[in-house]
Regions:
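Short loop/turn motifs that connect adjacent beta-strands in outer-membrane beta-barrel proteins
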Residues: 24-28, 41-50, 62-66, 92, ...
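Extracellular loop and loop/strand-boundary signature of outer-membrane beta-barrel proteins
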Residues: 40, 84-88, 129-136, 193-199, ...
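Residues on the lipid-exposed face of transmembrane beta-strands in outer-membrane beta-barrel proteins
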Residues: 42-44, 55-57, 100-104, 114, ...
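Residues that define the transmembrane beta-barrel architecture of outer-membrane proteins
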Residues: 49, 94-98, 138-146, 162, ...
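Residue-level detector of the transmembrane beta-barrel scaffold of outer-membrane proteins
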Residues: 52-54, 111-113, 147, 163-167, ...
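Outer-membrane beta-barrel pore domains and translocons
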Residues: 56-60, 117-119, 151, 169-173, ...
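Outer membrane beta-barrel transmembrane domains
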Residues: 66-79, 237-377
Length: 377
């Protein structure tokens, strides 16, 4: 944790205090904008007839409860059988997500992208059962995003300093929404649906829209990215997730021909769930005594205890180990959270991403297995 406390200050110092850099075209291809944080979806349009691939590993920690802007203790909500309390209360949550993405550029202005993921969640709970503490667990594939990105404007076709792009796509329901509890201390609760937040999927086909603005003022790269996922349809359990909206602002400084530092502000707003699952109504899953007329077992089961607004600050380092490949490390902490609660609040996120570009024989950059030196790699 000492390293994590030092990292943001060190990266900000590089951004602010580093001496004037030489002229750079960026670590990524000049056509796609040169530099962009790899955690932001769809950065730039790749060179025509080129592939790009991205592998990312993220760890997220959530610690303590929040209702609105007020931090709460789990003891404020139980565990207790008394009215107004819950029989099970979350304490902490850890999430590991692996994401794999690929893209191909068909023209100078259009690229198709696909992103898939796998998530592993563990949540520490305290309950009225014996033993009282246990760890709830789930894992599985997430929904898959299929998107197209079109460049609406650029001031130069080959190496733009200003460009505006739009993203249209869909999230396909490849993630499950019916994962069940396997290790609850009360045996009758095993085999029952896990709460919403432990399900890796949405169960619905969801449209995606985005808009990205990028600008270069060498050695600085900057931009703003807006994305929304709209939840319009009910899934097989007769509910839908809340729609999501994200806005990312970033500033990057390239201080070396193979390295740069970045700072981001990442805002997100999302809605609650429309209803409880069908299994809750029919079988009493997530209700006390497994009776649909009784109170919720835990605040995680209440569809209204989701949604909110948060803002994270993110610092990062990108490094080019070999031509056409980039490694990135990002660290994020929340600076504002307003949650419909009680629900677990964000503590911090750590993400490592590896990215590589693969020119095909049709690409203007194709030179066999050697790097295109004329573009500065």
């Amino acid at each position: 944790m000492k390293f994590l406390k030092i990292l943001p200050s060190a990266i900000l110092a590089v951004l602010i205090l580093s001496s004037n850099a030489l002229a750079y075209i960026g670590l990524c291809c000049a056509h796609c904008g040169g530099n962009m944080p790899l955690n932001i979806q769809g950065g730039g349009i790749p060179e025509t007839h080129e592939f790009r691939f991205k592998l990312s590993q993220m760890y997220m920690s959530m610690d303590s409860l929040r209702d609105g802007t007020d931090e709460k203790s789990y003891g404020d909500y139980g565990p207790s059988t008394a009215a107004g309390n819950y029989r099970g209360v979350p304490k902490t949550m850890n999430s590991w997500m692996t994401m794999v993405g690929g893209a191909y550029s068909f023209t100078d202005d259009f690229a198709a992208m696909i992103m898939a993921g796998y998530v592993r969640n563990s949540m520490d709970m305290t309950t009225t059962a014996t033993p009282s503490d246990y760890t709830m667990f789930s894992q599985g594939a997430t929904d898959t995003k299929i998107m197209g990105k079109y460049r609406l404007y650029s001031d130069d076709n080959l190496a733009p300093k200003t460009q505006l792009s739009t993203i249209l796509g869909v999230a396909a329901p490849t993630g499950k929404i019916t994962i069940k509890n396997t290790n609850h201390p009360t045996k009758t609760m095993r085999g029952k649906l896990l709460p919403f937040g432990m399900q890796p999927g949405s169960g619905t086909w969801d449209p995606i829209f985005g808009l990205t603005y990028q600008k270069i003022a060498d050695p600085y790269w900057m931009g703003v990215n807006f994305m929304t996922t709209q939840r319009l349809f009910l899934n097989a359990q007769d509910y839908k997730k809340g729609s999501e909206y994200t806005v990312d602002l970033y500033l990057m400084r390239q201080f070396h021909e193979r390295a740069l530092a970045s700072f981001q502000l990442n805002g997100k707003a999302w809605g609650d769930y429309s209803d409880q699952p069908k299994k809750g109504k029919e079988s009493g899953d997530c209700h006390a005594m497994l009776m649909s007329t009784r109170d919720w077992m835990t605040p995680l089961c209440d569809p209204t205890n989701y949604g909110g607004v948060n803002l994270h600050a993110t610092v990062g380092i990108q490094f080019q180990p070999v031509p056409l490949q980039i490694a990135e490390l990002n660290f994020s902490v929340p600076i504002y959270q307003n949650l419909k609660g009680p629900q677990l609040q964000s503590d911090y996120m750590l993400r490592f991403t590896y990215y590589w570009e693969v020119p095909t024989k049709k690409s203007r950059r194709y030179v066999g297995f050697k790097a295109p030196e004329k573009l500065g790699f």
